[in-house]
């Protein structure tokens, strides 16, 4: 069973016709891009879903626990990658997309956005 991510949600109007699932970068959280929503001039209702990545130790940061979509084991090109962490995060994001579909957002109106590690 996929663990549900905690989220911050903002709707720009009643009955949103669009959904944006927006992933933050390493060490940030779902509140990171919350202030940006007010800067958009959107013609119709949009639901922004800002999930919080799980807290996990990040190897390149001395194993310090922080919000991360996956562990970063090495910065070397072709170096080892946290395939299990990447897969788990992909499953969690996929679940958020399913929830938005269940709420009535058609696939052609569902946008996935990400910054830094959230966009990788």
What is each stretch, according to the model?
Residues 2-111:
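Serine-hydrolase catalytic machinery in alpha/beta-hydrolase-like enzymes
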Residues 113-118:
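Gly/Ala-rich beta-loop-alpha elbow adjacent to hydrolase catalytic centers
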């Amino acid at each position: 069973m996929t663990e549900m991510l905690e989220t911050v949600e903002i709707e720009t109007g009643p009955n949103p016709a669009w959904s944006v699932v927006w992933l933050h970068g390493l060490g940030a959280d779902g509140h990171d891009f919350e202030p940006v929503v007010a800067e958009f001039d959107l013609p119709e209702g949009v639901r922004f879903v800002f999930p919080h990545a799980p807290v996990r130790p990040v190897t390149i940061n001395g194993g310090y626990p922080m919000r991360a979509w996956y562990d970063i084991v090495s910065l070397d090109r072709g170096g080892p990658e946290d395939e299990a962490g990447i897969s788990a995060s992909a499953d969690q994001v996929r679940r958020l997309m399913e929830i938005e579909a269940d709420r009535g957002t058609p696939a052609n109106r569902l946008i996935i956005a990400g910054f830094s590690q959230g966009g990788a």
